Amino acid sequence: MEQHGTNEGALWGGRFSGGPSEAMFALSVSTHFDWVLAPYDVLASKAHAKVLHQADLLSDEDLATMLAGLDQLGKDVADGTFGPLPSDEDVHGAMERGLIDRVGPEVGGRLRAGRSRNDQVATLFRMWVRDAVRDIALGTTELVDALSAQAKAHAGAIMPGKTHFQAAQPVLLAHQLLAHAQPLLRDIDRIRDLDKRLAVSPYGSGALAGSSLKLNPEAIAEELGFDSAADNSIDATSSRDFASETAFVLAQLAVDMSRLAEEIIAWCTPEFGYITLSDSWSTGSSIMPQKKNPDVAELTRGKSGRLIGNLTGLLATLKAQPLAYNRDLQEDKEPIVDSVAQLNLLLPAMTGLVSTLTFNTERMRELAPAGFTLATDLAEWMVRQGVPFREAHEASGACVRIAESRGVDLIDLTDEELSGVDARLTPEVREVLTIDGAVASRATRGGTAGVRVAEQRARVDAASTAHAEWARAGVRR
């Protein structure tokens, strides 16, 4: 078996007589996905250096040298001057190498005192996730704003509302669009709630048992923008429920986007004819010249399955690990990094797609009463006249049966046909057998009446603005 050679690039090796095999190293190396943590490694290392100094483990001069070296290393990481070498096992080893290159082994070699990769990576990963999900939250507000803008632009447009994908009741298009905004806002609520659990620092937990060097985990937590330090060092180094919760929140967001995408896919078909896609947000066919395909929506629908897979894979990784840290936990980062990357692609694309949709409101209005969508209004009119709903439901269903047999709408039934079904169906019932009247009558909170939808849009806009402000504020560090 080929040997890797030495333990150069690893943060261990004194107990070993030689380096790992090539296959072992290839399995172990992680810089191809954990390099995203490099900027956070610099921040955490600076905070760690300060507590080493407070514990009299670094002199004033060594601290100044180390902080200057870390600042330079951070700049070199940011501009691409410094990166991992093939011999680096992980981001932590690469960053220590970079620091030693800049300040020498005497000073650079002191930084590792009192910390383990176990508490280090758990902290850095939390820091990265906190920033990443804020970016996702901000992108989600932009999609919400696009839905709200289309709702405002088509405030009075009426469309068929559906249940079981069958004609149900007429609703405002704005009501339907805002119905997609609501779960997206809840997704941001979940991100913000998730941050409460992300904002606990594992730093200072060491490998699992804490540190004997009298360091100050609370000081590091505060400097790195955490709300508190962890209460239990074993849990802090080995728990990844914050990662699985993140995977769920991101998967749920993708699922909510997928539901919107599914409607867009249906609405742009000739059979529906509700919308026309912008050329900028659609594609064509290599063989069929007439095609304009909703690829953005289809990729959103497809990638939602990918994010669900990331969640289930991570849960399977975590399900049977004993305490404390196990190398299995190296598998925590790729699914989260991938889910974030996919959403960073999908959110601006879906926002662009939604904001450029052209709605065929005449077509929607034409189809709104199809399928006897005013049958409930007929029944509820009878209820307002004092008829028990059970009887009103039966009468309305009988009217539908007659209209269906004649191939006409409910409003086309004659007065004689209506009264023949039930004498209490007087000509006044025609007042509710219009889609405008039906929509306007549903004026309870959350309903489809124009005044209520306007209230909903105002609340959506206010929530989106507040979420965007939170996301832009970032983590205080």
From Swiss-Prot:
MF terms in GO: argininosuccinate lyase activity
Enzyme class, spelled out = lyase
- Report keywords, A-Z: Amino-acid biosynthesis, Arginine biosynthesis, Cytoplasm, Lyase
Would you tell me the Gene Ontology cellular component terms?
A: cytosol
Which pathway does the record list?
Answer: Amino-acid biosynthesis; L-arginine biosynthesis; L-arginine from L-ornithine and carbamoyl phosphate: step 3/3
Name the Pfam families on file: ASL_C2, Lyase_1
**What are its GO biological-process terms?**
arginine biosynthetic process via ornithine; L-arginine biosynthetic process
Task: Name where it mostly resides.
Answer: cytoplasm
UniProt keyword annotation of Secreted present: no
* Record protein name field: Argininosuccinate lyase
Q: What is the lineage of its organism?
A: Bacteria, Bacillati, Actinomycetota, Actinomycetes, Mycobacteriales
**Gene from which the chain derives:** argH
